[in-house]
């Protein structure tokens, strides 16, 4: 009860111990809410009654009462966008499984984050059921981490940002830096003599990690560029400075690393942004874009995967040019339409491809987007992360495969290149689909637009 009151900034009475916990007015909390499955008792949405019922359902002194998930929120999103992101993640990953989620968002400018407290028992119209042991498995936790990255990246793309989150370890990302430690204490208090010993030790460990990371980047500035462009393919000087400050020990080391990166031959200056701000990338990203273009041009020039005109069919002629292009020859196609038109056109194309012996599969960056693609078009769909895992395990697309990627405008350069490489290896057809209004909202040129220009799509 005390933890629930503290996180939500609420006043709650603990019936078991007869104690009232009052954290009303606690600073930094910008939103708190309880989300639960439909058709549940009204008391579930009352924080005090909910957590008193949770405590009453457990009899052992060492019982686990709840699970806490903490997620960092992208600083690029505004408060309304962050709330929408957290709600979608909770609804898809937790509430849909029968959990109750009591969450709050803390809105510090440098570290916005959300605390999500989950019940361990499913809830129905009759109340709490038995504890769900399968919610505790490592595979489930890994799925939650991957799902958070997918959902956050989807929302970042919707808001027009190119920055991306990667849930994998730095080692898996092939980034030669050590992960930092979460300190759990405000920066202003870190020199406080009254800090408990475990926090002092944690701070010392973080200082050591920052020093070693700084030494690594000083010895090889390309490490910094690889790590930064993995998050931000195009970055400003301010973003470079922010990145290096958080990964170096002190001002002297920071300035030395910054100078080394600026003098690095792998740093590439780009044309200034619309606001006049200088922008940069790395030679590795430039070569990745060239590779993407070469592959797209090669795939577009291939014959095959066409449906004869007399076997195409279509219920309306509103998208005839786009429809004919999709069903024509070539192993890569792009499509930009409003959501409603896109769904109707893809559903018609799906029927035509399937009727001509092709296997049509769908994918999207997030679980929600994949589900929407499947329900609106009938194309069986999975997340892109699930497909990538399949490809890493040896699974391949085949010559009769058509892979439809929705929300393509939000994909990063390396991820889009991996998808096209998988289609290219199997001689499959890749169909990249973007929503017109979302493509227009992108604050930087997207890899999707690069592909579209490379294959000269006009209709």
Where are these regions (language model features)?
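N-terminal nicking endonuclease/strand-transfer module with a His-rich metal-binding environment
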Residues: 1-249, 255-263, 275-279
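Conserved, well-folded catalytic cores of nucleic-acid-processing
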Residues: 57, 92-96, 117-123, 151-158, ...
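Pre-Walker A (Motif I) flank of P-loop NTPase domains
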Residues: 67, 328-335
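Short beta-alpha connecting loops at secondary-structure transitions
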Residues: 132-136, 272-280, 403, 430, ...
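ASCE P-loop NTPase helicase motor core
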Residues: 240, 334-459
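Interdomain "pre-motor" coupling segment immediately N-terminal to P-loop NTPase/helicase cores
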Residues: 246-309
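N-terminal pre-P-loop "Q-motif" helix
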Residues: 313-330
